[in-house]
């Protein structure tokens, strides 16, 4: 549940005492490091009324400052973090920045798609946004990914945004309202995105990041090689018979 997020970035006195007694200094240092990454505040969206509504719930906390929105379903692996790339673009343009990624035409109906005007190598001025268009109706193949840097004007725009047929306030619709008064940019970031909202995407992300860990990678690679050679089933069957 949502408590797991808060607990992950908090300290557990009971756990720290256990780790200290067991002499597990490395694990102890790790949980202390995580709790010091930033100062965290939490606001809950009491009803599932859309991403735009969720952002509105945070209005009092954000105040009159630009802020970032990161959706957990999108996991991005990049040497230069995606958000760092976006902050660099924001510092140049001083306007809302949306992360975008090229997708195949047949996938446009699964994403918000921008109508782009090229500005520089990876930067596009956004002329319009269309939510989940058919391949024929899509203005481009540049899809919105779950990373945004938004200016506080988005709050007024969201308050002017009508609910959709499902009773939700959609961020894409709010961004279209904001486009009336603000130039907005899309950044085609450098990095690999995984859709953790799908089972396969979640598995791919888990494997990719596990293969980057020195404590897991060697044995995991061996296991994956066994899978590719069809040896795992035979090994499991042999172990079953022996037991």
Ranges and model annotations:
Residues 1-2:
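A conserved acidic beta->alpha catalytic loop
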Residues 5-13:
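Glycine-rich loop at the start of a catalytic domain that most often binds anionic cofactors/ligands
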Residues 14-18, 25, 31-116, 150-152, ...:
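Conserved beta-loop-beta/alpha segment of the NTase-like Rossmann-fold superfamily
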Residues 68, 87-91, 118-222:
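Catalytic-core segments of class I nucleotidyltransferases/pyrophosphorylases
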């Amino acid at each position: 549940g949502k408590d797991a997020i808060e607990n992950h970035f908090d300290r557990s006195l009971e756990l720290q005492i256990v780790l200290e007694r067991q002499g597990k200094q490395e694990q102890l240092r790790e949980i202390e490091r995580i709790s010091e990454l930033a100062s965290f505040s939490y606001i809950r969206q009491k009803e599932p009324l859309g991403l735009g509504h969720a952002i509105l719930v945070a209005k009092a906390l954000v105040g009159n400052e630009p802020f970032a929105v990161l959706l957990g379903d999108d996991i991005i692996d990049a040497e230069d973090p995606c958000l760092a790339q976006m902050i660099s673009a924001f510092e140049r343009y001083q306007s809302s920045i949306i992360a975008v990624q090229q997708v195949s035409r047949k996938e446009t109906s699964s994403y918000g798609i921008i109508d782009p005007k090229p500005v520089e190598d990876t930067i596009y001025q956004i002329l319009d946004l269309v939510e989940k268009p058919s391949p024929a109706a899509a203005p481009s193949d540049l899809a919105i990914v779950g990373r945004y840097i938004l200016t506080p004007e988005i709050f007024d725009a969201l308050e002017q945004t009508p609910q959709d047929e499902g009773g939700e306030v959609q961020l894409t619709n709010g961004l279209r309202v904001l486009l009336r008064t603000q130039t907005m940019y899309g950044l085609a970031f450098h990095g690999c995105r995984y859709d953790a909202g799908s089972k396969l995407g979640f598995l791919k992300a888990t494997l990719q990041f596990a293969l980057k860990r020195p404590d897991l990678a060697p044995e995991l690679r061996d296991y994956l090689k066994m899978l590719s050679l069809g040896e795992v089933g035979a090994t499991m069957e042999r172990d079953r018979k022996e037991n």
